[in-house]
């Protein structure tokens, strides 16, 4: 057979297959076939082909379409008026299941209303015969089961040209997108949203009202606050400060007022301005669980007869967690980029050696022998405490009292609200240059090289001896009943108050150690980032096991047994261990981060040009002040200096650190407060 004969044979075979496919397609959709004695229109009249079934008589459509509809959707189509009976498999089907996982289910995807309106308008614009033909096609496809639908679609797409296939591809791309957040149960939707960052959550809340309700829910933002507030997020590296304690106190007082002192003449809670004008209440300091006091429900409301519990007064007032995060995020961003306002306090006539601030109260001590109390909001000097005969080197206050230490060898307790000196303690043989109290325990460090412990409950006192030079700073940790001390002998010591012995000595500084600050227990440090420099330079007391036992046994850092092994037998399972991390500063111009359980120096911070006198730290940052008149902000995990502040004309001698502020005192007689509030 010649090449031309083969070619002609292939063409005839292709035409035969095409005609057979076309006849099958027309038969499926009710169009006339060649078997009915009608010729096929030429290709130039393809439009007439599309609606050839429009010329079919109503009897033909009824014979082909009606039985198909009655067989597959009897509950919707019963042309003979017979009672529709659902098949057993369909009547028992659970429509709550996705049809993809239940083959006996039909797709119940809801049609898009705007799209259907558009289709309806286009359909109505066609002639009556064309409308009937298209409706028949739609009805057949709608009634067909899944297997038949696929066959119908395959037949349609087999006859589509490339522009039509391109249209299908573009249309399907949008149709297969589903609103999974709205379709899923809320619990699963919350789980998904909890994986998003803040930017993605804010974008998700703009999708629709349904998405906004879920993306703004407290479940999602409470999780976000847990990951970032008062700690560094392991995923994004961001950490945000705690809630403003003043705002927490005001919210707590408002709840207490509504719960206990309500009367019928009160129409609402106290205004924030009224709360802000009142001085601190003198109650105990806020505990950690009070961070979320604004979210608590007030359940102890009055039950007097005739009281309308549905009134606005009795409605629980919540502060959304998203608002909490937003507030803290602004402050955290200001910290990161150094955006702050500065307020200067002038009044001392000699160098400022110590300070502390809480809410709107600032206390400063100076070599001019006075203590001054300031209002941080107005900058006004409220009162001056006089009584010491020499320079004041250290102080600390709470809601009810202020304790100060002076070079005149005395410790004084003041009522800082009235300026009255309540009592004076003597016991040191040299000037008192460091003190710290927690609960009923007061520790003081002195020029006489000792640490003295004062117990306000049983009125007992004792001394801790071991340093060979001035003790510059002390810190009490009542939960573990231990004390940290820093000295001019270039060491830091950890003392056990129960045994009155030194349980660890930290060596590493080559200059006089001026400050020691235990870090909060929430602080976490990645061990692989440690710059272990002097593992063998720290020593322990005779009854303590070697520092490396914790690592060698593979125990968790905060496990009770490992802590007991690290600090000695006196730390049994029921006794808390000291804070795991601490930071120190010295006149060797460095700051060091230590692990107390092993005695290792994990990181050394370099950057100051002269000795570091002042130090403050929390879970997010370290703030230091030095002889070089500079203040530096450090990331304790990376060791990076994030920001440097200047402005003092003398050495920076003291620092107070808060969540959104820090204050510095200098030998230039000034105090500067840096506020990062938005």
Swiss-Prot record:
Gene Ontology terms: biological process: protein polyubiquitination
Gene Ontology MF term list: ubiquitin binding
Gene Ontology cellular-component terms listed: nuclear SCF ubiquitin ligase complex; nucleus
Alphabetized UniProt keyword annotations: Repeat, Transcription, Transcription regulation, Ubl conjugation pathway, WD repeat
Statement: the UniProt record of this protein carries the keyword Transcription: yes
Biased composition (Basic and acidic residues): 35-49
F-box domain boundaries: 178-224
Entry-linked SUPFAM superfamilies: F-box domain, WD40 repeat-like
Family assignment from sequence similarity: Belongs to the WD repeat MET30/SCONB/SCON-2 family.
Name of the featured protein: Probable E3 ubiquitin ligase complex SCF subunit sconB
Organism: Emericella nidulans (strain FGSC A4 / ATCC 38163 / CBS 112.46 / NRRL 194 / M139) (Aspergillus nidulans)
Gene: sconB
């Amino acid at each position: 057979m010649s090449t031309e004969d083969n070619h002609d044979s292939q063409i005839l075979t292709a035409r035969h297959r095409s005609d057979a496919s076309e006849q099958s397609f027309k038969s499926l959709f009710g169009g006339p076939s060649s078997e009915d004695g009608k010729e096929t229109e030429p290709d130039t009249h393809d439009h007439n082909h599309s609606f050839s079934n429009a010329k079919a008589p109503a009897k033909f459509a009824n014979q082909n379409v009606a039985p198909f509809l009655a067989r597959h959707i009897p509950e919707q189509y019963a042309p003979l008026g017979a009672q529709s009976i659902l098949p057993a498999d369909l009547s028992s089907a659970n429509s709550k299941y996705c049809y993809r996982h239940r083959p006996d289910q039909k797709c119940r995807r809801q049609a898009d209303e705007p799209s259907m309106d558009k289709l309806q308008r286009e359909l109505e614009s066609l002639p009556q015969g064309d409308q009937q033909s298209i409706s028949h096609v739609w009805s057949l496809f709608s009634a067909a089961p899944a297997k038949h639908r696929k066959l119908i679609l395959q037949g349609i797409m087999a006859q589509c040209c490339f522009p039509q296939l391109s249209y299908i591809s573009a249309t399907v791309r949008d149709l297969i997108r589903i609103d999974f957040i709205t379709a899923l149960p809320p619990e699963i939707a919350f789980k998904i949203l909890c994986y998003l960052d803040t930017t993605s959550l804010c974008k998700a809340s703009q999708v629709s009202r349904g998405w906004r309700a879920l993306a703004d829910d407290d479940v999602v933002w409470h999780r976000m606050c847990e990951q970032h507030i008062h700690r560094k997020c392991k995923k994004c590296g961001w950490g945000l400060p705690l809630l403003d304690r003043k705002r927490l106190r005001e919210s707590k007082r408002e709840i207490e007022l509504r719960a206990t002192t309500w009367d019928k003449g009160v129409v609402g809670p106290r205004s924030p301005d009224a709360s802000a004008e009142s001085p601190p209440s003198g109650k105990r300091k806020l505990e950690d669980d009070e961070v979320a006091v604004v979210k608590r429900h007030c359940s102890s409301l009055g039950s007097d007869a005739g009281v309308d519990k549905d009134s606005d007064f009795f409605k629980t007032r919540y502060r959304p967690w998203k608002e909490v995060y937003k507030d803290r995020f602004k402050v955290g961003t200001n910290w990161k980029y150094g955006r702050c306002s500065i307020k200067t306090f002038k009044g001392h006539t000699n160098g400022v050696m110590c300070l502390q601030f809480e809410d709107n109260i600032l206390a400063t001590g100076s070599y001019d022998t006075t203590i001054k109390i300031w209002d941080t909001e107005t900058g006004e000097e409220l009162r001056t405490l006089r009584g010491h005969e020499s320079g004041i080197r250290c102080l600390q206050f709470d809601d009810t009292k202020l304790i100060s230490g002076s070079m005149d060898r005395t410790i004084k307790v003041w009522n800082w609200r009235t300026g009255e000196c309540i009592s004076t303690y003597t016991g040191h043989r040299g000037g008192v240059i460091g003190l710290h109290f927690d609960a009923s325990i007061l520790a003081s460090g002195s020029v006489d090289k000792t640490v003295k412990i004062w117990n306000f409950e049983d009125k007992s006192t004792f001394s801790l001896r071991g340093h060979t030079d001035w003790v510059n700073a002390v810190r009490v940790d009542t939960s573990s009943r231990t004390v940290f001390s820093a000295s001019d002998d270039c060491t830091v010591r950890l003392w056990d108050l129960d045994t009155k012995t030194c349980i660890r000595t930290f060596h590493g500084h080559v200059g006089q150690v001026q400050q020691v600050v235990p870090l909060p227990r929430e602080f976490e440090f990645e061990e692989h980032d440690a710059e272990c420099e002097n593992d063998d330079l720290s020593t322990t007391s005779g009854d303590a096991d070697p520092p490396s036992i914790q690592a060698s046994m593979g125990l968790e850092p905060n496990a009770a047994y490992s802590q007991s092994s690290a600090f000695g037998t006196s730390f049994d399972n029921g006794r808390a261990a000291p804070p795991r991390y601490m930071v120190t500063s010295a006149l060797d111009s460095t700051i060091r981060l230590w692990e107390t359980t092993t005695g290792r120096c994990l990181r050394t911070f370099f950057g100051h040009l002269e000795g570091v006198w002042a130090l403050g730290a929390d879970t997010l940052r370290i703030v230091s002040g030095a002889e070089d008149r500079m203040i530096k902000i450090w990331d304790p995990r990376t060791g990076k200096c994030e920001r440097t502040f200047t402005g003092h004309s003398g050495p920076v001698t003291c620092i107070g650190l808060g969540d959104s502020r820090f204050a510095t005192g200098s030998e230039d007689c000034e105090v500067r407060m840096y506020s990062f509030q938005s």
